[in-house]
Every structure is written in structure tokens, then in C-alpha cells.
Amino acid sequence: MPSEGEQRWVVAIMAKAPRAGGVKTRLCPPLTVAEAADLYRAFLLDKIEQVRSLEAASHGIAHTPDDARAIFAELAPDFILIPQRGGDLGRRLVATFAHFFAGGYTGVLLVDSDTPSLPTEFLLQALDVIAKPGTDLVLGPSEDGGYYLVGLRAARPELFEGVPWSTSGVLPETTRRARDLGLGVAWLPRWFDVDTGPDLERLRDSLAATAGPLPRHTRRFLDGRPG
């Protein structure tokens, strides 16, 4: 936990337990439910490695369901682990931000677990801009109208309550609320989630065109499953 007066940051992954039938069901078909769970586990492992590489921040996972703690303790034994609290995604985001701010962190960045090809540079940029005076909110927009990252310098529950989650209206509504609250907003580059069959093919194509081993767990899964 940060000492009094010390500026500290935390990057936490919003994650689900990689259980068959509970994750990535929109990828079935082309995947089976077991394959979808294995793919999501690969996404998680890659995101954990990516977040762990951020030396300027503490690292956490907000997990669901509550009984999944042992799974995440095995996947990321060095991470802060907390259960997600609340009904919809908005309430869970509010509770997760509240938990970390209560722990004394200066800024909190929450990232999704559906963007295995997201460049680490984007997360480094988020840590840079959240530390700048005048930045209250950092958003990493997703192509589907949501966001892959949201960061705050103080709890702002009004940003998340009553938002039409899982629709293309999430980002516009969040932006409108931030403007109404007078918040200074910093933007990251747009990126894509992997939720559907076409998304998976796009991921496969983008990784095939990209040099380097990362994201290594996702690459291993895709290499073992011909397209």
C-alpha cells in the first residue's frame, strides 16, 4: 500500500474465471465452449504478463465470480486480487475503483481482458497521461463503442451508473458525462476487442503480420488450431 504522501498507481485487470461456458460464448462457433475457455485463459495469461511488465505501477486483478480467487492466485500469485462487487458492469467498476482509492492509490487504471494484441505502449501512455496535472480521466476506446481501459485520479461513480452497457452507446455516454462534470479527459488510441468469429480471424491475421513472440499464450493457442 502506498505510504502517506507518496504518488502511486495501480493497473488492474477486470477478469472472469476461464471456465467453459462462462467466457467467450460469442466465439462458439467457431470454437467449442472448452476451446473458448482455453483461448480466454491464454488472453488472461498474456494480459497478466503485459501488466506485470509495467514497473511504474502496482498490479491487480478484479475477478468474478467470488470463488475464482484460487484460480487467479495460481495465474498471478504476485498480483493484488479482489472480487468484483455489484450487479452490472457499472457497479463493479465503481466498487473496484473505490477499493483501490481506499487503499491510498493516486490513480487507478482498469483494463479489460479481451485485447490480447493491445500494444504495451498504450498502457505506458496511460500511466504517463494519468500523472499529468489536469488529467482526471483516461479512456482507451474500443471499436465496438466501449473502452478497453478507463483510468481515474479520484472516484467518479456518476460516470458509470445507469450506462447502457454492452452497446455502442457506452463511450459516447461516458464522454458526455465527463464533459458535464468538467473532467479533463486524455485519450488513448482506438483498439479492437476479440468477442466474435470475425474478431478472432482479425486477431489471427494481425498476429501473423506482426513480428515477435507476444502475445505468446494467444499465439500458441492459435498456432495449435488451424484457421
Regions found by a protein language model. Give the residues of each.
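N-terminal nucleotide-binding beta1-loop-alpha1 segment
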Residues: 1-26
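Conserved alpha/beta core of the MobA/IspD/sugar-nucleotide pyrophosphorylase nucleotidyltransferase superfamily
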Residues: 2, 173-227
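A short, N-terminal amphipathic alpha-helix
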Residues: 38-57
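Short beta-strand/loop segment that forms part of the nucleotide-sugar
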Residues: 56-65
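Short phosphate-binding loop-to-helix
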Residues: 71-108, 167
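Catalytic metal- and UDP-sugar-binding loop of GT-A-like glycosyltransferases, i.e.
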Residues: 111
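Conserved donor-nucleotide/metal-binding helix-loop-beta segment in metal-dependent transferases, i.e.
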Residues: 118-144
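Short, glycine-/small-residue-rich phosphate/pyrophosphate-handling segment
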Residues: 157-175
